[in-house]
């Protein structure tokens, strides 16, 4: 009976693997954009699997790597390609089964719970020996065809490849979430192998592609900037300013105020919904509908907006995003099934006078804010910048819908549902 249950768990896990492989998924996320951060106008509202896997989805965030791979691609005849794909699938299945059968029943149950939840609920760490090496290819038990050199995966990487991102190749492409016990540990004896405790790393090309550019002058307040709106008691003395057009924000702090590290405002088009949300914990979940959710629930806010587009986008926010303050800056993890769009002064080339809007696919993380870079961008020796408040401590995030040159929405205030994250500069 014990063996029967374990075998059933293994079969159930294999049936829950991420759909598609590299060839099947190529170009899925590119839409009309090809392979970079350009031309997402046709795909801004497309849903993706909870894992956010697939070469196409990685392509828009890791465009340079994907283009390099395509440049060295040599097409195979259909029969040859199908045979190679079938062999790779068989190898991966054999390797995965051999690894899973080494796990205890309780470990298999924890892994299955994490995989079937698709990151919608907080699941426990799955701690396994970190030195276990999985080889796929010649020399490995799973391989019979010596056509290519063997691929070696750590156990966490293998499980991420099987259950989230079939095109995953290297550990440098993933980032461990701060909620994980293995976060920040180097070569531990036991490492967490929960595939939903890692995210796909969104790397930006250098220099950034010409997508959704904004003049840096828009960072400066305009002459018709309205008066400051008095803050509520929960903002810790934060005054909120909304310059015309872009609705950018500035954080004005009372001396000695260290009660929060950022403030979050939720907007529907040009209307702010609910109060400003002060963030004191290092991690915050922002979601609309999340099982066992703990954080900023947008679904509990009272909104009078009757727009069908707003209501449609609101229903797609789902698990939303995770905002975390870490040693190197502030990271945003897209937990939803749809892309998010981010604009931040610290994501761009400091010598550029333009800002970009960056598209982040489901399952990906991006370092949305860098404190050190933000301080350097203040240009303390620049007389013009010293005379006016600066908005570089603000990040704007739109759910599902993008804005900029590739869209009819030129400004984020035209987006149905979006966030403004205002960082404490002290």
Curated annotation (Swiss-Prot):
Post-translational modification: Phosphorylation on Ser-249 does not affect its stability, nuclear localization or inhibitory function in TGFB signaling; however it affects its ability to regulate transcription. Phosphorylated by PDPK1.
Primary location group: nucleus
Positions of region (Disordered): 14-40, 67-88
Motif interval(s): PY-motif: 208-211
Biased composition (Basic residues): 67-76
Region feature Important for interaction with SMURF2, mapped onto this chain: 208-217
A Pfam cross-reference name: MH2
Biased composition regions of type Gly residues, renumbered to the chain: 28-39
Recorded GO MF terms: activin receptor binding; beta-catenin binding; collagen binding; I-SMAD binding; metal ion binding; transcription corepressor activity; transcription regulator inhibitor activity; type I transforming growth factor beta receptor binding
Stretches of the chain forming a coiled coil according to its record: none
Tissue: Ubiquitous.
Binding-site list for Zn(2+): 125, 180, 192, 197
All copies of domain MH2, residue ranges: 261-426
Modified residues (Phosphoserine): 249
Taxonomic superkingdom: Eukaryota
RNA-binding among keywords: no
Family membership: Belongs to the dwarfin/SMAD family.
Function as written in the Swiss-Prot or TrEMBL entry: Antagonist of signaling by TGF-beta (transforming growth factor) type 1 receptor superfamily members; has been shown to inhibit TGF-beta (Transforming growth factor) and activin signaling by associating with their receptors thus preventing SMAD2 access. Functions as an adapter to recruit SMURF2 to the TGF-beta receptor complex. Also acts by recruiting the PPP1R15A-PP1 complex to TGFBR1, which promotes its dephosphorylation. Positively regulates PDPK1 kinase activity by stimulating its dissociation from the 14-3-3 protein YWHAQ which acts as a negative regulator.
Designated name of the protein: Mothers against decapentaplegic homolog 7
Organism classification: Eukaryota, Metazoa, Chordata, Craniata, Vertebrata
């Amino acid at each position: 009976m014990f063996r029967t249950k374990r075998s059933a768990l293994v079969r159930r896990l294999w049936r829950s693997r991420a759909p598609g492989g590299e060839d099947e998924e190529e170009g899925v996320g590119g839409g009309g954009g090809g392979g970079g951060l350009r031309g997402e106008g046709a795909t801004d509202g497309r849903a993706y699997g909870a894992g956010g896997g697939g070469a196409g989805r990685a392509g828009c965030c890791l465009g340079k790597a994907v283009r390099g791979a395509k440049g060295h691609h040599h097409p195979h005849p259909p029969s040859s390609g199908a045979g190679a794909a079938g062999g790779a699938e068989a190898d991966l299945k054999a390797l995965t089964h051999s690894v899973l059968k080494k796990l205890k029943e309780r470990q298999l149950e924890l892994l299955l719970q994490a995989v079937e939840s698709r990151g919608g609920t907080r699941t426990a760490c799955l701690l396994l020996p970190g030195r276990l090496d999985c080889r796929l290819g010649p020399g490995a038990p799973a391989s019979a065809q010596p056509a290519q050199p063997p691929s070696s995966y750590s156990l966490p990487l293998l499980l991420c490849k099987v259950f989230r991102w079939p095109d995953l190749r290297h550990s440098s492409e993933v980032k461990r979430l701060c909620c994980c016990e293995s976060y920040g540990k180097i070569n531990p004896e036991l490492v967490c192998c929960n595939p939903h405790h890692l995210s796909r790393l969104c790397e930006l090309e250098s220099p950034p592609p010409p997508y959704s550019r904004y003049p840096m002058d828009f960072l400066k307040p305009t002459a018709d900037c309205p008066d400051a709106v008095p803050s509520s008691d929960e903002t810790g003395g934060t005054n909120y300013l909304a310059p015309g057009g872009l609705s950018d924000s500035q954080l004005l702090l009372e001396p000695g105020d260290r009660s929060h590290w950022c403030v979050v405002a939720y907007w529907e088009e040009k209307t702010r919904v609910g109060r400003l949300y002060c963030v004191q914990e290092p991690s915050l979940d922002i979601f609309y509908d999340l099982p066992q959710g703990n954080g900023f629930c947008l679904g509990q806010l009272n909104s009078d907006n009757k727009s069908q587009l707003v209501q449609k986008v609101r229903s797609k926010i789902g698990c939303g995003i995770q905002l975390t303050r870490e040693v190197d800056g502030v990271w945003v993890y897209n937990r939803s099934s749809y892309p998010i769009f981010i604009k931040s002064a610290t994501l761009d080339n400091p010598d550029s006078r333009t800002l970009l809007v960056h598209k982040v696919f489901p399952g990906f993380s991006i370092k949305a804010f860098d404190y050190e870079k933000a301080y350097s961008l203040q240009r303390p020796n620049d007389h013009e910048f010293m005379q006016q408040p600066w908005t570089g401590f603000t990040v704007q995030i739109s759910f599902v819908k993008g804005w900029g040159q590739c869209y009819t929405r030129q400004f984020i205030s035209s987006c149905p549902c979006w966030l403004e994250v205002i960082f404490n500069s002290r």
